[in-house]
Every structure is written in C-alpha cells, then in structure tokens.
Amino acid sequence: MVSSVLEVSHVFCCPNRVRGALSWNTGPGGLLAFGTSCSVVLYDPQKKVVITNLNGHTARVNCLQWIRTEDGSPSNELVSGGSDNRVIHWELENNQVLKSVRLQGHEGPVCAVHAIYQSGPSEGEQHALIASAASDSTVRIWSKKGSEVKYLQTLSFRDGFVLSVCLAILPGTNVPVLACGDDDCRIHLYIQQDDQFQKALSLCGHEDWIRGVEWATFGRDLFLASCSQDCLIRIWRLYMKPASFETKDGSLRLKENTFTIKDGGVRTTVAVTLETVLAGHENWVNAVHWQPSFYKDGVLQQPVRLLSASMDKTMILWAPDEESGVWLEQVRVGEVGGNTLGFYDCQFGENGTMIIAHAFHGALHLWKQSTVNPRQWAPEIVISGHFDGVQDLMWDPEGEFIITTSTDQTTRLFAPWKKKDQKDRSQVTWHEIARPQIHGYNIKCLAMIDRFQFVSGADEKVLRVFSAPRNFVENFSVISRQSLSHMLCDDQDLPEGATVPALGLSNKALFQGDIASQPFEEDELISPAFGSPQVTFQPAVLNEPPTEDHLLQNTLWPEIQKLYGHGYEIVCVACNNSKTLLASACKASQKEHAAIILWSTASWKQVQSLAFHTLTVTQMTFSPDDKFLLAVSRDRTWSLWKRQDATSSEFDPFFSLFAFTNKITSVHSRIIWSCDWSPDNKYFFTGSRDKKVVVWGECKSSHNPMEHPIRPCSSILDVGSSVTAVSVCPVLNPAQRYIVAIGLESGKICIYSWNKTNQEINDWTSCVETNPSQSHSLGIRRLCWKSCSDDDDDDDDDDTEQSEEGPEWLHFASCGEDHTVKIYRVNRRAL
C-alpha cells in the first residue's frame, strides 16, 4: 500500500474526567472508545495504538456507547453526547468514519446516552433506538433507520436530573424498556407502547443519587444493575408474571412492582423484584456493567458477572456462588498511593478476560486475567496522556523522546518502547515512561537544557530546573534499547530518584543512602503525623513502560535549582543551542515586567535583562548559531537581539537590540503567537492571530540594521484561521525549499514550503494539511520538528532510509488545548 504524504504515527491522550466517557466494543479485537476533550478516540488495546479520532463535537465529550449487536459481534456504530448539547451517531467502516448524524434538541449538556437495535415490522429489519439525558432535566428519544433520524419523544423530569439511562428489549417481546437513574434516589422505568414511552413504575431503595444503570438478559428474565452514591449496588429482576400468580380476588402480589404491557394485541403482566444488594465499596459507586455476551465454541455465552467502579479507588468483579447463588466478590483491583481520587468508570473487554478502569485524573488502568490462575489479574500497559490542555513540548536534543507540559499540573515524558514480536521482528510503540514533575500550579512552558535536564515555568514566579535520576536513565536505556554507557558517560553522582515532601512543591533528590535508611512499614505506621516526610520512592528495574501507579510515585526528577527574578507568572522559556543560556519571560502589562531575563546555565545567575516589549512576550527562540535571540509579543511586535562577543572569557556574552518592529512597521495587526528560525540562520518566521505568516530577513550579524533593515521578504501568507504555532524543519525539501509547519486555532496543521523569490509572489507552496481525523479538535499550542539523525527510529524499516539529499521521512510533534499530543511523519520527497 502506498503511504500518504502525512501520517499520524503516535497519539497520547486520556479520557475526559466525567462518568460514562468510556466504552469497549464487544467481540475479539474490539476497540476502546473514549472521549478526549471534544473528540472521540478509538484505541486498540491489543496493538496499543490509537486507530483514529472522531471529530464532530464542539465542546467536551461527556458520554458515549457502542451500540451492541445481538450476536456479540463487534459493532460499527456508536453514539456520543457532549457539552455542546448534541448527540452524534457515528457509523464506521474499517474503523474510519463512514457517516455521522447530529441529533439536536437538548438545551443543556448531554450527560448520558444509550442505544440498542430494535426489530422492525419486516423480518430482518432493524433500526437504532437512542436515548439521551441532559442537564435540561429531559430525556430525549430518537429512532435511526438507515440515514434517516426521527425524533420520537421528550421525557421531562421537571427539576430533577437523570444521571444515567439504559435501554433493553423485554425478553420474548419487541417492547423496549428504558431505565433512568435520577437524582431523587429512584430508578424510573418506561415502556414503549404505540411508539411512545410511558412510565411504568419507580424503583425505590437507594438513598442517594443513582450514578449507573444497566440491563442484561438471562434467559426469559431481564436483570437491572444499579449503583449509587450510597456506596451500594442493587440488582433487580424483571420477569413476565404468569397468570397463576394471581389470587382468587384478582389482586396481584407485589402490586407496587408490577405493570402491564401490550405486545401484538396480547397483554402481559411484568413483575420487578429486588434480587440482591451488594455492599463492598466504601465510597460512591460510579459505574456498574454486566459482562457482554460472546461466542465460545460456536455457542453464545452470557456470563453472570458484574463489574463496578468506585471513588474508593477500587474496581470489583462480582458473581453469584455456584452452589448457594449468593453474590460474592470475586476480584478486587485498584490504585495504591499517589494523589488520586478513585474511579469514574469501568468496562469489560476481550470476552471478560480484560477489565479497564477510568480514574479521576483521566488515567486508564487495565488488568488482564491470568490463563494459569483465573483468579489472578495482572496490570497491563495502556495509553496515557494529559487530562487538560497541553501547553508546550520539546524533543530531546537527540530526538529520542519528547517532554510535554500541561495545565493539568504535570510534566510528562514519552519515549519509544522497542521490543521483539514472536517472529523476532522489531516493534516500536510510544508510551509515557516518566512523570518528572507533578506540581501544584498549571505548567505553561519548558525548555531542554541538556539531554536529561530541562527547565519549566508555571503559574508562579519561579523557574524550576530538573535533572534525570539514575533510575530513570537505567530504565530508559532498557525500554528504548539504548546503550547505558552512552547515557552515563562519566561516573557522576546521580540521585536514585525524587520525592515531594508533604505540603511541598519541590522534588527532593533521594540518594542510595536515603533509600537504604527509610523505615519499614511498621515504623511508618507509628511515625508522628507531622514528622519528617515519608520516603515513597522505590527504585525499580523496568523492561517495559511503567503503570500509572509507578508513574505517580517513582518517576519524579529531582529539582536542582530555582530561578527567581520575575514578578508575575512565567509564560515562555528558551535555551540556546550551546546550552549555556536560558531566556525567560512572564506575564506583563508594563514594559518593566515584559523584560526578558537571561540566565547562565553554569552559575544559574541572571546575566542580563532585555527590556523592549510593553506587553507579554509569547515566545522566544535562539537562532541555530546562537548569534540572535528573537522574541514576539502580545504587543504585536517582534524584537531581535544580537549577541556581542565577549572581549574576555571572564565575562558572559550579552545581547543588544539589533532590530525590531513598531505599530507602523509591524505587518501583524493582532497578537503574535509564535516564531521560528530557518536552519541556515538567514530568515525567521512569525505567526499571528490575524491569520498571517510572514518571513523576515535576511539576518546577518555583520550587517548594520540601519543600512540593511530587516523587512518582510515573503508574500503575506493568509491561512484562513488564527495562527498559534509555527515551526521550521531543520532540513530542506528535495527542491531546497524551507519546510514550514503551521498550527491553527481550529486544530488543523498545514505544511508549506517557501523559498525567497525576486518578485515575492508564488513563493509559498501548500504541501499538505491534516484531515479531520488527523487534526486536533482545539487550538494548537506548539509544534516541534524532530532533529534529523542517521539512526532515525520508527515503526517501519522504511523510515530509516536515507538518501544523499537527506532522510525520506521527517517527524514532528504537536500539542494542543484538546489534551492531546501527536507525533506525525511526513514524506519529505512528496513535499
């Protein structure tokens, strides 16, 4: 198959922090669907890769569900609901969107959605019945047949809120039943009669909000599982009541729990009884799910097993005892340690041999059943990522991993996991292998100082410098199959790891002696409540990516320095290519606060303050030869600073203002968000909210800016949307033109090539842009090209091919407000 020009090779993300944003397709090889920001992500847990993104919502995706088939085969339809008040029905083909239909009518965010297939009047005819609940206190019902969607009904709950809905077909009939979990502590049952849902009865018993309801059919009976904030799970049995249950006077037993349905002209009495109450969780139970039916040896199996997830950080697998029929806890799994707050949701997968939980901070926890001991479950590797907008990212200097920062107050490191398959073929997948910083402020920017050292800035006045511990370097070398001696070239005294003291924000370095002297568990139990901070770091030798529990506690990097000098929150930071200088800037509404501070990476002292801009500096970048520092600002101008060669080695080089624009000479009419240099130091590129990208130059340190002013040297490129990120590839295309990646506020990424022409017309050439499934769903925050090296690593051997003119495949990473980090590969020969 011929590869396309632009491909998404790796995606890092996690589910939204809401209940119901997770659904696992039934059948072998079923995909896991979850909502990430405004997108629906389809993830393959077996291959550990994201298959595609479904972009259609304009606000957060709150709930979704695969429409299950009767025979247990994988479904190709799913429904999702979001904070944009919409429900979207997705139809897939080969795991790609074939068509999508928007169902509108709700006047508030959709919080729950469910759908089933219902048989039509003709044999073999089916249509989808969809129910959705929203914060407008209504449940809306739709019917979808083919490409036609028909609105059926609205169920009003006045001042109440329905938090969960579930549809099913009454056994032996074609009558749908709808269960609605309400905030009045009751479950309301509705029966469809003459195409309209009518209330049948309400089930009482729970003492707090109903968080989840789900039906399952076992023979002629229908079972309903419900969970609540009262920490309990209730299982209700719904069955057709024979006429023999009637007493002589015609009254019915359990009258309050019976109702009558009419199907095909025949009236039938249906009874509902409480089967059992399950008490095992110690906090709110947020989700409960029956194990889906599946085929085994050609026979459709429906196991009687129930999975529940709770805010007590545990997930329990329940099943009735074979002898007594009493429901018992079979398996309990969960989180241990860390700053976590329990589980939002859970799902069965792979015929019940895998279970997954969705944690409060977005993390997924996957467990797989042992084939040797069925009662033993082991954690598995699963996708991870930020749960809030990703603000910045950087490749390490050798292009072997990326570090990202986010307003979720974490810094994360993603790297390739290189392993051999059963046929001894090399396989590469990317995973989060470290979480160097878990902070108390939103982290806004970072810069790599060295291969294993970076500086980050957050919504505080301090810059923090981190250095990798020995345990990380050792594990990284094993996971990525790199030479440890190449990484630890000298015998420096590296700390083993780091920990955060109680009520602290600084990662404290831990050395071998600190770990050896830590108390035993018994001593920890009797330690004073306000004594010294407990050591939680435990060094571990890993040969595969770590689990979420390990990431939370054992992958912090020690903080080696704090840099004080700014008066407001840090906005951007940059490091020069020789790794000797840092430049940083903070929020500012006055010139004195908008000054750029230069720091020495040798002494960690301020070298110089560069004052020019009157508002916040949004991005800075050093030229590849380190002779210039470029800054762009919210004041719609840029400034170019030239390094002065020091007359003596005792003095650090300093920068002087070389060129700038003002309100008259500035081409941009709105905030300039981004800038970057061409690899030959001649030109620099600026991108602005005014939808323009401009090339400026030429820049020569020997020129006098008065005699050779730096002006626009390109035609103005209008990309049709606000430009939020610009990045220039370090290599040229085969035609020796500059390759420029442009990130837009719409989430799209466009790649252009540019070359200076005498007429400044036709100098821009559009090469390729991301399609809807490849794009981010919200604004791009940063783009960064990978440095090109001879040992380029990726999934395919083709990626390592080098021609005399350069590599065939180029790689760049992107991050955005949609919580997602993506790595793309581009065919250089096609640009």
Curated annotation (Swiss-Prot):
GO terms for molecular function: endopeptidase activator activity; protein kinase binding; RNA polymerase II complex binding. Pfam families: WD40. GO terms for biological process: proteasome assembly; regulation of receptor signaling pathway via JAK-STAT; transcription elongation by RNA polymerase II; tRNA wobble uridine modification. Pathway: tRNA modification; 5-methoxycarbonylmethyl-2-thiouridine-tRNA biosynthesis. Signal peptide: none annotated. It is found in: Cytoplasm; Nucleus. The keyword Transport does not apply. InterPro entries: Elp2 (IPR037289), WD40/YVTN_repeat-like_dom_sf (IPR015943), WD40_repeat_dom_sf (IPR036322), WD40_rpt (IPR001680). The keyword NADP does not apply. GO terms for cellular component: cytosol; elongator holoenzyme complex; proteasome complex; transcription elongation factor complex. Component of the elongator complex which is required for multiple tRNA modifications, including mcm5U (5-methoxycarbonylmethyl uridine), mcm5s2U (5-methoxycarbonylmethyl-2-thiouridine), and ncm5U (5-carbamoylmethyl uridine). The elongator comple catalyzes the formation of carboxymethyluridine in the wobble base at position 34 in tRNAs. Belongs to the WD repeat ELP2 family. This is Elongator complex protein 2. It comes from Mus musculus. The gene is Elp2.
